[in-house]
UniProtKB/Swiss-Prot annotation:
Gene giving rise to this polypeptide: ints13
Source superkingdom: Eukaryota
The species this protein was found in: Xenopus laevis
Main location: nucleus
Record note on quaternary structure: Component of the Integrator complex, composed of core subunits INTS1, INTS2, INTS3, INTS4, INTS5, INTS6, INTS7, INTS8, INTS9/RC74, INTS10, INTS11/CPSF3L, INTS12, INTS13, INTS14 and INTS15. The core complex associates with protein phosphatase 2A subunits PPP2CA and PPP2R1A, to form the Integrator-PP2A (INTAC) complex. INTS13 is part of the tail subcomplex, composed of INTS10, INTS13, INTS14 and INTS15.
UniProt-recorded name of the protein: Integrator complex subunit 13
Family: Belongs to the Integrator subunit 13 family.
Length: 715
């Protein structure tokens, strides 16, 4: 069936009876000059609009927004009702514009307060509205012609918006009954006509408007289905700006519109004569403009998940949230912008305000405005752009994240491009076990009732996901092949005796692994050192296994027996605990021994480095003294001696047991160099500041005299 929604046809029925000429009692200041007033001049009194004027203005605003955003395929038929009904336009495309409607309303004029109210009724307009809905529009005629013999496949739906001043709830009910009966009568007439269409669905919206300050005689009522054809709802609204706000909310609901508020629009403020003397003319202020558009302009924005919740707010007198976007002046070329994923027509909410008109003229002159999401931190994100095409303004949606032309991201690509260890293989197996397929045979539950296959599939999916870690590093038991027999059957709705034995056997195997101190596949990612000790690893494993079994313990009696077996194996006997303590003490001793060996090696290396340093200093001193003796004229030439090699100092070369350290290489080099030198003189070894006293043994034997006589006799 070719579906035309209820928004395809909208019929406005406005009451033109004498009581609609009553004042709405909402005053409007007519004389706005409050400063520099000449003395003696009495200010003009405030004015107020009639109920008719408020109804016409609000309905025209509804039509303006609809025509701005949907210039095609959304049609309006305007009817006024007093002593008779008068249709101001038709469903033809040339009549679908505000100029035609306003010209027709000007001809009608305001209601006559002196007319006889008994002769006027809103029922004339409602009957005419039902008759208008039965007429075929150009779009419906094109669809019926294209379908040829299947013209009945084209649906006919519509909406009636009635603005009146009802007397009571019973009066409203009478209007609804009249519309319902009229629809059934006209459907019978349309069944035998080629120029009319039966109404499949009609949405009646009754707006009871009354002056400000009075009590409403009609109560609100949400949408209610009166028959298989008619759905009705009632709104009781004060006249004036309250009625305009209500119709603004309804147009958003009826046509799936969303609101976007553009903030920080730079614009010079409008100043009065007295204000211009106080404020410089070149100053500027930031203004806000609210725009309406189709809600699909926010779909990608909401999917991205960034900035939407923080940038949305509820405006005063507004039905829905409005998304706030900031005026942006980027320093980039238009070529560097992201791809445009959609363009939607816009309509300003307050079309007559100066900020709205300035923004509209700015865009119609060929300029574009980039809009960014307000963010507390980080770089700006340009998500939308305003631009005009062919005299119409569009809100363009820019791709603010990954381009739709790129390949989709990998399943293992997390936030910021970080690759995480998802259980991709296990998830593929999980999908195979829970895939949907046709269910050929009817099954029954335990109580005899039929079992719905979809509900059975949901229950199985719920059991399989009670405990299912998504990341490899967050689980131990799902990385162990020994736990697979238990993990694969514990998720069943009921266990057989064989399944119970397999689960118990798996638990006993884990106990045996713990007794043998076998290693477990514990992830040490992000940790320093060796990770948790062996008994700590098994404690983590047992806790996770208990979590898995406890999630399914209420499934059946055998599930409970698996849990009892697990708890019995976890409660170790005293000798087992004593063995564990001894094992922990042995591990602590081994760790302390390794630490002492490392400290001893470190001290040994320090002593070796000190010894090498002293030997190097001694070599430097020997070289300096040799240079002094050689340069002295009295010193004879030293005989050429073959270097004496001390064999006992050079032991057999040890075989390298691996890569040698720098200290070992340097020590080997120094030992080799020292072994090739002759034995040092005793006097030089015992010298002080490289000065050795000669004939010291004579002095010790004969005293100081012998030395002096010896010196004198030499002279």
């Amino acid at each position: 069936m070719k579906t035309f929604s209820e928004s395809h046809k909208t019929v406005f029925v406005v009451d033109h009876c004498p009581y609609m000429s009553e004042s709405c009692r909402q005053h409007v200041e007519f004389d706005m000059l409050t400063k520099n007033r000449t003395q003696g001049i009495i200010p003009l009194a405030p004015i107020s609009k009639s109920l008719w004027t408020c109804a016409v203005e609000a309905s025209m605003e509804y039509c303006r927004i609809m025509y701005d955003i949907f210039p095609f395929r959304k049609l309006v038929n305007f009817i006024v009702s007093d002593s008779r009904s008068r249709t101001l336009n038709s469903w033809n495309r040339e009549d679908q514009n505000l100029q035609e409607l306003m010209a027709a309303l000007a001809v009608i004029g305001p209601p006559n307060p002196r007319a006889d109210p008994e002769c006027c009724s809103i029922l004339h307009g409602l009957v005419e509205a039902v008759e208008s809905l039965c007429k075929i529009t150009d779009f419906q005629h094109e669809s019926r012609t294209a379908l040829m013999g299947n013209a009945d496949w084209v649906a006919n739906r519509g909406r009636i918006i009635c603005i009146t001043n009802a007397k009571s709830d019973s009066h409203v009910q009478m209007l609804e009954d009249c519309v319902n009966e009229t629809i059934h009568e006209h459907n019978k007439m349309a069944a035998g006509s080629d120029h009319l269409m039966q109404i499949q669905k009609c949405h009646l919206v009754l707006l009871h408007t009354y002056p400000v300050g009075e009590d409403s005689l009609v109560s609100d009522r949400p949408k209610k289905e009166l028959s298989n054809v008619l759905v009705s709802e009632v709104h009781s609204v004060k006249a004036g700006r309250h009625l305009s706000t209500k119709l603004n909310q309804l147009v958003q609901l009826h046509f799936d519109l969303a609101s976007t508020t553009i903030t920080n629009i730079p614009m010079k403020p409008t100043l009065s004569v007295c204000d211009q003397e106080e404020q410089h003319a070149n100053t500027s202020a930031n203004y806000d403009v609210e725009l309406l558009h189709h809600k699909e302009a926010h779909v990608d924005f909401i999917k991205s998940g960034e900035g939407y919740t923080g940038s949305s707010s509820i405006r005063e007198n507004s039905l829905k949230e409005t998304v706030t976007l900031k005026w942006c002046t980027p320093r980039t070329n238009s070529v560097e912008l992201h791809y445009c994923t959609g363009a939607f027509r816009i309509s300003p909410v307050d079309v007559n305000s100066r900020p709205s008109s300035c923004l509209t003229n700015f865009l119609l002159n060929g300029r574009s405005v980039l809009l960014e999401q307000p963010r507390k931190s980080g770089s700006k994100v340009i998500s939308h752009m305003l631009s005009s095409h062919g005299g119409e303004i569009f809100l363009h949606v820019l791709s603010s994240s990954r381009s739709i032309l790129e390949d989709p991201p990998s399943i293992s690509e997390g936030c910021g491009g970080r690759v995480t260890d998802y259980r991709i293989t296990d998830f593929g197996e999980f999908m195979r076990e829970n895939r949907l397929m046709p269910f050929p045979e009817q099954s029954y539950q335990m109580d005899g009732g039929p079992e719905v296959p979809l509900e059975r599939a949901k229950e199985q999916l719920e059991r399989h996901t009670r405990y299912w870690p998504m990341i490899i590093s967050q689980t131990t038991i799902f990385n162990m092949q020994a736990v697979v027999p238990l993990a694969s059957v514990i998720v069943k709705e009921s266990l057989s005796e064989e399944d119970l034995l397999n689960c118990q056997k798996t638990i006993y195997n884990l106990v045996d692994m713990e007794r043998k101190n076998d290693p477990l596949p514990i992830s040490t990612a992000g940790t320093r050192g060796k990770g948790p000790k062996r008994d700590e690893q098994y404690r983590i494993m047992w806790n996770e296994l208990e979590t898995l079994v406890r999630a399914h313990v209420s499934g059946s009696e055998r599930h409970q027996r698996v849990m009892e077996c697990l708890m019995a194996c976890r409660s170790k006997p005293p000798e087992e605990e004593e063995r564990k303590k001894r094992g922990r003490k042995r591990e602590d001793k081994e760790e302390k021994g390794e630490k002492l060996n490392k400290d001893h090696e470190h001290d040994k290396k320090g002593q070796e480095s000190e010894r090498i340093k002293s030997v190097l200093d001694q070599e430097k001193e020997d070289l300096a003294e040799a240079e002094v003796i050689k340069d002295s004229p009295d010193s004879p030439e030293p005989p050429n001696k073959k270097p004496h090699i001390v064999i006992e100092d050079t032991g057999p070369a040890e075989k390298s047991k691996g890569p040698m350290s720098l200290l070992s290489l340097w020590s080997s080099r120094i030992n080799t160099a020292n072994s090739r030198k002759h034995q040092e003189f005793v006097g030089r070894l015992n010298s002080v500041n490289n000065k050795a006293e000669l004939y010291q043994h004579l002095k010790e034997e004969n005293g100081g005299e012998g030395v002096e006589n010896g010196k004198a006799s030499r002279q």
